[in-house]
Regions:
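PLD/PLD-like phosphodiesterase catalytic module centered on the HKD motif
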Residues: 2-192
């Protein structure tokens, strides 16, 4: 999910109209394409400032040992198969309509990939999805918020009711965060 400047502006307009906007995407630790996270991450603060609710999928399954490549890049697809949970299907629920598909709503899906999606007009399905998100998001995703200094915090709601707060992308090293920031300056967002 790379909203781009135009997409971020559109989401802001929805909020101005009073529409609740909630996005669930992969955290860096659950992402199978680390470079995409670099371009998504630069829009988080702006989206949060505009009242867009952001959630990042937690890496639910962990292997005990990761390869050097996985440690450096954050990749979650090792040579012998997937080792962590990640989000691939996309869905949106808006005004009684539901979109379900593989389309990422980013430049790569628009211009480079072959993607598919369905729009289903069903208030009942939209309500069910909304209720499921309300019930399960805290267990499967970090909730992103802005602290009093305007910096992102990640809230991890535990089964015992405790909330763990992170001030950096959970599950990342300083090197990975530096690389994410460096890559975000490359002029390749249109390919993400």
């Amino acid at each position: 999910f790379v909203p781009t400047q135009q997409g971020t502006y559109y989401l802001k307009l929805l909020r101005v109209e009073g529409i609740k906007v909630r996005a669930l995407t992969n955290s860096f630790a659950a992402n199978d394409v680390a470079i995409v996270h670099a371009f998504y991450s630069q829009y988080r603060v702006e989206m949060l400032k505009n009242g867009i609710e952001l959630y990042e999928f937690k890496p639910v399954l962990e292997r005990r040992r990761r390869t050097w490549y996985e440690i450096v890049t954050g990749s979650v697809i090792p040579a012998k198969g997937k080792n962590k949970s990640s989000l691939h299907a996309k869905f949106f629920d808006v005004d009684g309509k539901v979109f379900i598909g593989s389309f990422n709503f980013d430049p790569r899906s628009t211009y480079l990939n072959t993607e598919v999606g369905l729009v289903i007009e069903s208030s009942q399905l939209q309500t069910q999805i909304s209720v499921m998100l309300d019930q399960h998001l805290p267990q499967v995703a970090y909730q992103l918020k802005l602290n009093s200094q305007g910096q992102i915090t990640w809230l991890d709601y535990q089964a015992n009711g405790q909330v763990i707060e992170y001030d950096k992308d959970p599950g990342t090293s300083r090197f990975q965060r530096t690389m994410i920031k460096a890559v975000s300056y490359l002029p390749i967002e249109w390919m993400m």
